[in-house]
Amino acid sequence: MEEPLTVAAIFRGPFNILAISEVLKVVAAVGWSVNYIGMVHRAWKDQIPSIGILPLCCDIGWEFVYAWMFPDFSSHWQGVVRVWFFLHSAVLLVTLKVSPNDWANTPLAHRHIVFIYIFVTIVFGAGQYALAAEIGPALGFHWGGALCQFLSSSGGIAQLLSRGHTRGASYLIWFARAISTFAGFIKLCIRFQHNVDGAPWLDSPMCWFYIVTVLSFDAAYPFLYFSMRKFETPAPQREARIKKQ
């Protein structure tokens, strides 16, 4: 029986390109974990959610399906998906605590915040399960994760634009997400070239559209964040800077 491809298995043999893919997997695993911990910290500190409802609920739905319902198809992550599920659960708890501060101007949603988050999470979980049933859990793991990543990157941009300020956001949250995304994409390309984990989805034009779009969102985010921060500079400091110019 062929030994599963793991960090230990690869590094027991001669160093090769697949060893690099394992290192990138570790980078992505740590990076996403830092991203989630950073969201908990920033949301609690600023008393406002650090992530939108759609990306958060989609992430939890995907993680639940592949951590508990189809664990064999996330086994190459060696339990990391379960860790992410618990970290995201912590993000959800903090988000529910501080969401009233963000939805104060929407009375109907304000009164039903808990129900809304639970309902949307169940819907995304059902959708992830349906996708796995439709195209198989192996591809469903990748495409369901692609949706999570698209919503996470686009949601960060949308959150800045809709709020008009940087509360609830930080360079750390962005950097951890961006480096994890980039490392994950390179890992998938390496594994695709070596036919590991059965990743035929990189042959899809839609997949490359998704990759380019997500990377573009993550590349644009720090510039938008920096622009927002300039507008948040206290008036006296801003006027002093203008006079110096």
UniProtKB/Swiss-Prot annotation:
Top-level EC class: lyase
GO cellular component terms, semicolon-separated: membrane
Keywords annotated in UniProt: Lyase, Membrane, Transmembrane, Transmembrane helix
GO biological process: terpenoid biosynthetic process
Membrane topology: Multi-pass membrane protein
Transmembrane segments: 17-37, 51-71, 76-96, 113-133, 138-158, 170-190, 206-226
Annotated Pfam families: Pyr4-TMTC (PF25129)
EC number: 4.2.3.-
GO MF entries: lyase activity
Source superkingdom: Eukaryota
Cellular compartments annotated: Membrane
Protein's pathway: Secondary metabolite biosynthesis; terpenoid biosynthesis
Keyword Membrane on entry: yes
Miscellaneous remark of the record: In A.calidoustus, the austinoid gene cluster lies on a contiguous DNA region, while clusters from E.nidulans and P.brasilianum are split in their respective genomes. Genetic rearrangements provoked variability among the clusters and E.nidulans produces the least number of austionoid derivatives with the end products austinol and dehydroaustinol, while P.brasilianum can produce until acetoxydehydroaustin, and A.calidoustus produces the highest number of identified derivatives.
Functional note: Terpene cyclase; part of the gene cluster A that mediates the biosynthesis of the fungal meroterpenoid acetoxydehydroaustin. The first step of the pathway is the synthesis of 3,5-dimethylorsellinic acid by the polyketide synthase ausA. 3,5-dimethylorsellinic acid is then prenylated by the polyprenyl transferase ausN. Further epoxidation by the FAD-dependent monooxygenase ausM and cyclization by the probable terpene cyclase ausL lead to the formation of protoaustinoid A.
Family: Belongs to the paxB family.
The name this protein goes by in its record: Terpene cyclase ausL
Lineage of origin: Eukaryota, Fungi, Dikarya, Ascomycota, Pezizomycotina
